[in-house]
Design a protein with these regions (language model features):
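Conserved beta-strand/loop scaffold segments within soluble protein domains that form the structured core
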Residues: 1-86, 90-93, 107-109, 114-135
């Protein structure tokens, strides 16, 4: 049934960009308890560090007391890929616009899941924050 399918698949999807001296700790837990046979859980934490002074800690945790489940976790954090930035700049984008394109490409799938009534407001706020940070 549709109601029971909600509990068959759960996703934790964290994406973002850290600037200046920002620090972030991700603690995600997927707990497969008895009775959840056939369930799938995914958790991921992906961050772009826009400054070498940022700190990103990712602590995904999978707990399981059931058979026949699938649990996946992933984590990735790093500086902007300068090859990508260079590529965009050779296509006419400024450094600032290239940075925004890369960050937006990371977080856009999450923004697109938001209710339409707030989507543009959230995207505008992200752009505003990136525009006011060190370049």
């Amino acid at each position: 049934s549709a109601a029971s399918d909600v509990y068959k698949r759960q996703v934790i999807d964290v994406k973002g960009a850290l600037s200046d001296t920002a620090k972030k700790i991700f603690r995600g837990t997927l707990d497969f308890k008895r009775g959840c046979s056939g369930s799938v859980g995914d958790e991921g934490d992906y961050a772009i560090q826009l400054s070498p002074k940022t700190k990103n800690i990712s602590l995904p945790l999978l707990l399981c007391t059931e058979d026949d489940v699938s649990g996946n976790h992933a984590s990735s954090a790093g500086q902007l890929d300068m090859n990508t930035i260079y590529f965009l700049m050779t296509r006419g984008f400024s450094l600032e616009d290239a940075r925004l394109i890369v960050v937006e490409a990371l977080i856009r799938p999450l923004i697109d899941r938001l209710d339409e009534s707030v989507r543009e407001e959230v995207l505008a706020e992200v752009r505003r924050k990136l525009d006011t940070k060190e370049k």
